[in-house]
Amino acid sequence: MTSQIKLIVGLGNPGPEYAKTRHNAGAWYVEQLARWHNVSLREEPKFFGHTARIQVDGQDVRLLIPNTYMNLSGKAVAALARFYQIEPEAMLVAHDELDLPPGIAKFKQGGGHGGHNGLKDIIARMGNNNNFFRLRLGIGHPGTKELVAGFVLTKAPSSEQSLIDAALDESLRATDILFKQDMTKAMNRLHSFKAEKV
């Protein structure tokens, strides 16, 4: 396998009241990735989340959606990464991104947490190692910092949700390129995509 990714994490909050909120964009991606590969996510208490395993060119890639609240995401990630001896450089973490508009998604390696509590906890629990890959799923920004908490915990209007969904679809295609070729080609594909309003 050309890709070195061995763990893909989708961030979100647990429970039906959060399932359709913007903050769960990362979890949506992993749910769709599991469907794409015809596997079911199942609860695994020792990893504090729902997990699945897919095979890419004979190599296992683990999928994880933490069952913890967003600000404790690192608990699940660290537990699974330690158990399977997966280094941060072999992890891809999908999360909602305020600094990108709906309809845009981008891969990135390393960097800070940008105020995202899920990323913040993962970095802390991975020994302050931030060198994992991220899939940043644009949800847009409400305009001021004070509005962010309410914004991420509400549903996007259908006009924005359709753009987010289109970017999720393209992210799945880019992930396929990542598996079959490499991150550079996957980035080139994804970073040239912009969903258009219907």
Swiss-Prot record:
It is an enzyme of class 3 (hydrolase). GO terms for molecular function: peptidyl-tRNA hydrolase activity; tRNA binding. It catalyses: an N-acyl-L-alpha-aminoacyl-tRNA + H2O = an N-acyl-L-amino acid + a tRNA + H(+). GO terms for biological process: protein quality control for misfolded or incompletely synthesized proteins; rescue of stalled ribosome. Keywords: Cytoplasm, Hydrolase, RNA-binding, tRNA-binding. Disulfide bonds: none annotated. GO terms for cellular component: cytoplasm. SUPFAM superfamilies: Peptidyl-tRNA hydrolase-like (SSF53178). Its EC number is 3.1.1.29. NCBIfam families: pth. HAMAP family: Pept_tRNA_hydro_bact. Belongs to the PTH family. This is Peptidyl-tRNA hydrolase. It comes from Aeromonas hydrophila subsp. hydrophila (strain ATCC 7966 / DSM 30187 / BCRC 13018 / CCUG 14551 / JCM 1027 / KCTC 2358 / NCIMB 9240 / NCTC 8049).
